[in-house]
């Protein structure tokens, strides 16, 4: 008998925290953050995406559709994949600076601060990426 864990089972024991810092100002970075997050969700990984800076706008209805990037999956599709099986959070300070409230964001999107981000990023088995 082997003690080797199957790859998918091993992935389920890990979590991925993705911090998206770019919006329409840097479309490739913005799309890449969601592409990686959606791929991780599809692999069965626990995923949390944090929308900071200009990426905070993607937490609002219709905003993801404004990003168009050739040869990339549409951002609304990627965002929906993350929302279906992961967590999507808008940074508290970023939301406040942009006048975004809990009533403004998409269903399933939360607004939370740095303490929650640090807790998620430092959780055992977590990997954090910043785009």
Where are these regions (language model features)?
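A short aromatic-anchored loop/beta-hairpin motif
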Residues: 98, 102-106, 111-122
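Histidine-anchored nucleotide/phosphate-binding helix
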Residues: 30-44
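A glycine-rich helix N-cap at a beta->alpha junction
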Residues: 65-95
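N-terminal beta-loop-helix "entrance" segment that forms/cooperates
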Residues: 55-69
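Aromatic- and Gly/Pro-rich donor/ligand-binding loops
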Residues: 129-131
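Short, glycine-rich nucleotide/cofactor-binding loops
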Residues: 15-31, 62-63
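Residues at the starts of beta-strands that form the adenosine-phosphate
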Residues: 15, 46-48, 87
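Positively charged, low-complexity intrinsically disordered leader regions
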Residues: 2-9
């Amino acid at each position: 008998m082997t003690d080797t864990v199957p790859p998918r089972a091993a992935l389920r024991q890990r979590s991925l925290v993705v911090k998206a810092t770019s919006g329409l100002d840097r479309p490739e970075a913005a799309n890449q953050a969601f592409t990686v997050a959606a791929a991780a969700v599809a692999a069965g990984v626990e995923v949390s995406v944090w929308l900071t800076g200009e990426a905070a706008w993607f937490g609002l209805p219709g905003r993801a559709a404004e990003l168009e990037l050739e040869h990339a999956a549409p951002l609304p599709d990627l965002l929906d994949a993350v929302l279906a099986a992961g967590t999507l959070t808008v940074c508290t300070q970023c939301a406040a600076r942009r006048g975004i409230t809990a009533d403004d964001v998409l269903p399933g999107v939360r607004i939370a601060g740095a303490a929650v981000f640090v807790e998620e990023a430092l959780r055992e088995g977590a990997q954090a990426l910043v785009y």
